[in-house]
């Protein structure tokens, strides 16, 4: 209250992961270099700085099944033919939702969605935009190899793509 202008929309992509850095910024806490490796404070946006942009090119997503995705601008790339485990299609019946197992070998290896025109992620456009798949795939690989998507020292990683 009293910090963020009311009823304002911004077009900058932030994620749940950014709450750590933002709340640390609000409270004056310091986030160690080996914590919150993908977290960026969006406090400047809350204060009304419409020109602010995060110090990263894309937001990394990690599913319940341990699958990676990346969102950059209007694009979202999933390096997995399924849903990530929370809904169909998934390779095993879900423990949380009543969904059937799907043979993922019948589905495309990559999924690319244009979230400006397809927010529901119904139309995979990976074949139509191979250059975007390559660019975002390289970016995600770099983030994973560095153990972070934000500036700072590289961190150990426990997953690869």
Where are these regions (language model features)?
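Glycine-rich phosphate/pyrophosphate-binding beta-alpha loops
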Residues: 63
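WW-domain-binding short linear motifs
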Residues: 57-60
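Substrate-binding rim/cap in mid-to-C-terminal beta-strand-loop elements of soluble/periplasmic
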Residues: 1-52, 123
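Residue-level detector of beta-strand structural context in well-folded domains
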Residues: 66-68
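C-terminal helix-and-tail extensions that cap enzymatic domains
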Residues: 45, 55, 160-161
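Long, internal low-complexity/basic segments
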Residues: 19, 72, 83-85, 91-111, ...
């Amino acid at each position: 209250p009293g910090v963020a202008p009311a009823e304002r929309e911004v077009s900058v992509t932030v994620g749940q992961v950014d709450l750590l850095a933002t709340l640390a910024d609000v409270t004056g806490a310091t986030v160690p270099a080996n914590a919150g490796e993908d977290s960026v404070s969006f406090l400047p946006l809350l204060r009304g700085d419409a020109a602010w942009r995060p110090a990263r090119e894309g937001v990394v997503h990690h599913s319940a099944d341990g699958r990676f995705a990346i969102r950059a601008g209007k694009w979202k790339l999933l390096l997995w033919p399924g849903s990530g485990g929370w809904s169909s299609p998934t390779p095993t019946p879900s423990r949380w939702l009543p969904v059937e197992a799907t043979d993922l070998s019948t589905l495309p290896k990559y999924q690319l969605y244009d979230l400006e025109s397809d927010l529901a992620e119904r139309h995979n456009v990976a074949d139509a935009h191979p250059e975007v798949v390559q660019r975002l795939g390289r970016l995600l690989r770099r983030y994973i190899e560095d153990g972070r998507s934000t500036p700072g020292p590289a961190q150990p990683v426990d997953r690869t793509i």
